[in-house]
Amino acid sequence: MKKLYLIGKSLKHSISPLIHNKILSNFGIDAVYSNVELPDFEKLKEFVEMVKKDGDVVGFNITIPYKEDILEFCDEVSEDVRIIQAANTVKKEGEKLVAYNTDWLGFKRSLEEVGISVKDKRILILGAGGAAKACIYGLYRMGVKEVFVANRTYEKAESLKEVFQDILKILPVEWLRRYEFKYDIIINTTSVGMFPNIESSPFDFENYVAGIPVFVYDMIYNPPKTTFLEEAEKKGSKTENGLKMLVYQAVEAEKIWFDIVNLSQSFLLEILKECEKKI
């Protein structure tokens, strides 16, 4: 039986195995997907060594906080990873580890389904890590020319200017000044507000008087409605959580590992419903 993994620091509440194992079963693929928690960088190194030696491992997904660290161990990267400098999917190809990013594809598809136009909109990204990079790249692929980025460490937001200098303009915003400007769309890519710390929010809409955003997106899916999204809805913004993004990026990863074809919309809805029950 072939093996697939999700690696990250804390995966107790991850529903990725549910999604992937359902897809594998649907296509009759003899493989199992499971979570592996890695508490530190040393354990990440050990995991990579294990993967290289185990002939049954096809590949793995990466989540917080290793989406950037994993590149150190990869032999090749896809074009999007070369730009984004973060990966969420790795495939074993012979002796080589090849890094891909399907996060931006999942994000882009979930945004397109909501029917929100991002062109010529003032967009604020909260966070500047691997998830933020995928989000920014997805927006670029949707025609966005510039984005505002607020991060607790201003230097990290500033560093994204160099990452994306060839494709779009990054406008860093100091964390404490994130309420001063008007935005049409606000996107949270941080883990602030994720279960179990559900009272937290990366943006206090009570403090925000510059205008009501048209759309507010949270990459978090557990809880399904974060404090961040609840407050945005009270103000009148349309909102979306990260569950569809999670499912759609998983589908794209399976395509990389097994060259599967697109899944039917009815099957995707079935997966989404099962995920909603699990959260």
UniProtKB/Swiss-Prot annotation:
Shikimate binds at residues 14-16, 63, 88, 103, 221. The active site is at 67 (proton acceptor). GO terms for biological process: amino acid biosynthetic process; aromatic amino acid family biosynthetic process; chorismate biosynthetic process; shikimate metabolic process. NADP(+) binds at residues 79, 127-131, 151-156, 219, 242. It catalyses: shikimate + NADP(+) = 3-dehydroshikimate + NADPH + H(+). InterPro entries: Aminoacid_DH-like_N_sf, NAD(P)-bd_dom_sf, Shikimate_DH, Shikimate_DH-bd_N, Shikimate_DH_fam, Shikm_DH/Glu-tRNA_Rdtase. It comes from the Bacteria. GO terms for molecular function: NADP binding; shikimate 3-dehydrogenase (NADP+) activity. Involved in the biosynthesis of the chorismate, which leads to the biosynthesis of aromatic amino acids. Catalyzes the reversible NADPH linked reduction of 3-dehydroshikimate (DHSA) to yield shikimate (SA). Belongs to the shikimate dehydrogenase family. Homodimer. This is Shikimate dehydrogenase (NADP(+)). The lineage of its organism: Bacteria, Bacillati, Bacillota, Bacillota incertae sedis, Caldicellulosiruptorales.
